[in-house]
Amino acid sequence: MSGRHNNKLPTNLPQLQNLIKRDPKSYTEEFLQQYRHYQSNVEIFKHQPDKANKDLSELVMFLAQVGHCYLEELSDFPQQLTDLLLNYHTVLESDLRMTFCKALIMLRNKDLVSPTSLLGLFFELLRCHDKLLRKTLYTHIVTDIKNINAKHKNNKMNTTLQNFMYTMLRDSNPIAAKISLDVMVELYRRNIWNDAKTVNVITTACFSKVTKILVAGLKFFLGKDEDEKKDDDSESEDEGSTARDLMMRYSTGKKTSKNKKKLEKAMKVLKKHKKKKKVEVFNFSAIHLIHDPQDFSEKLLKQLESSNERFEVKIMMMELISRLVGIHELFLFNFYPFVQRFLQPHQREVTKILLCAAQSSHQLVPPEIIEPVIMTIANNFVTDRNSGEVMTVGINAIKEVVARCPLSMSEDLLQDLTQYKSHKDKNVVMSARGLIQLFRDLNPKMLTRKDRGRPTESSKEAKIHKYGELEAKDYIPGAEVLEAEKAEDEEDEDGWESASMSDDDEDGEWVNVHHSSDDDQAEVAEKLQSIPEEERKAKAAMVSTSRLLTQDDFKKIRVAQMAKEVGNAPGKGQKRKNVDSDEEERGELLSLRDIERLHKKPKSDKETRLATAMAGRTDRKEFTKKRGKLNPYASTSNKEKKRKKNFMMMRHSQNVRTKGKRSFREKQIALRDSLLKKRKFK
């Protein structure tokens, strides 16, 4: 057994490596022998660095594996590998170069090499024309920095590494600069380097002359944080209880269609207020970390105006500028005439340009700056000579612009656009109704009387503020309900109200049974609607200044404010239906769905339908019955062989010669039947 090849340690490095890891001291001599062998191979390699050297490759990996066992003997080993790579990385054979890098990565994972020295070497190696090597180094850099900050953020090390990354971003080699940018973006997305310093360095990539670096920087700011998801399940118990109380209150009366409609409207208002109450989450926090967004957007616009990049890159720059202007509410008046030039129905990617126009609008922009943009959209898109889809997109874009800058809409243009509510195209009709619904909330007085819908207490209070006007209130709106509730409690000590099946019941109303304080609050709010507005403001101011409000008080105020949106205004009955809109809550950013929303899917032409049908037939099997085998890889059965065998080989077979044939009588009957059948069909 002693003569077996795998027990010869000098030539069997894996076995020696295994034994050394178990007992390093016992195999020191064998290790030193291999180390001397490695040094001699290095000398040979220096004379022919471009040749493949399998022995050197195996020895390097062996020493990297056992490096932690002999720290003194291998103290110069990492530096020696680093020098070899720095001096010969351009002429090294690709596999040997990869082996050297993997050995250094292994030593770094064992904390035998400092990250700063290794980072400088690896960024130097990124200049090599070796895609696999670049991918390996990129993965290691990201993973290594992640591991450094695994337990806690190592600010001292991060500062050193960040400064090195920032210098590499300005490197003359585009490959090294691009990978340094990719590393910073990846580390930001992993919440490792998510500080303002990193974000502001990435902004410099948006002015790079290298298109790939420019696009990577733009994509970073146009992305979205993955963690910011709308999760309706994360609502608080208070909000859930309010909805349950609302359901209980409206279900205690008769089950009439009138009660059902009131319940649906109340639930819509409740959902709307919940979304308003939620803590604001930013769609992408990187845009908020930019130190000087005004200067950044001005430089981007200047670069865009003189840019010779592809149209797709220009669109990305326009999107980023519009987001900066909209989110930070910047003054960039030259951007609107620039966008206005592209607002034509035949323009390529016109919906994205309309999105930019809407996103860059906000309430601090003077109305006379936005008004030409709206008129251009109306004149070029919302005309009868265009198709229904084009008109729909135009009205949707105008609606989104006006929602952010209401003063830019003139009353005459609004009257013209609302006339499309009776258009023959369903999509145009729904878009016009959406615009009407928007102005019912913003300023109903701008609509014609028949378009204002059923007035509510909330719509009576709605008005558009003048440009630059701020509404500073010295009271909490809705606080008067607390004073009214106090007076009600004094009158009715027991807190119960008699529920009688009287006129209200016959009229189809529900019975007011008190299940919680929310019901009391809603009824008190309904009574307060008959009080003059000035008196209510005075009561609210008195309550706001004379007592400390608790969480329960704020909840009562919130319920009362919601009741204003559900109930009719005093003396007003229901004359016509409200326009139901399926609008989503407007967030910080717009999406293309808001511009391209079509309520009715357009008909496909014949070519599109045929292509869809043919695409669905690719994986379909033939309409023939195939006797499948239990095992598809099994051999052919004897029955199948007999069926497929050549007849000339089978004619002298006993089975063929003794085969039973039809008798003369059977042939007569078959002939008679066939003749009768032919006669029958004549």
UniProtKB/Swiss-Prot annotation:
Residues 663-676 have a biased composition (Basic and acidic residues). It is found in: Nucleus, Nucleolus. Residues 226-248, 485-545, 564-587, 601-682 are annotated as: Disordered. Residues 228-240, 486-509 have a biased composition (Acidic residues). GO terms for biological process: protein transport; ribosomal large subunit biogenesis; ribosomal large subunit export from nucleus. Pfam families: SDA1_C, SDA1_dom, SDA1_HEAT. Keywords: Coiled coil, Nucleus, Protein transport, Ribosome biogenesis, Transport. Residues 254-319 form a coiled coil. GO terms for cellular component: nucleolus. The keyword Nucleus applies. InterPro entries: ARM-type_fold, Sda1, SDA1_C, SDA1_MD, SDA1_N. The keyword Repeat does not apply. Belongs to the SDA1 family. Required for 60S pre-ribosomal subunits export to the cytoplasm. This is Protein SDA1 homolog. It comes from Danio rerio. The gene is sdad1.
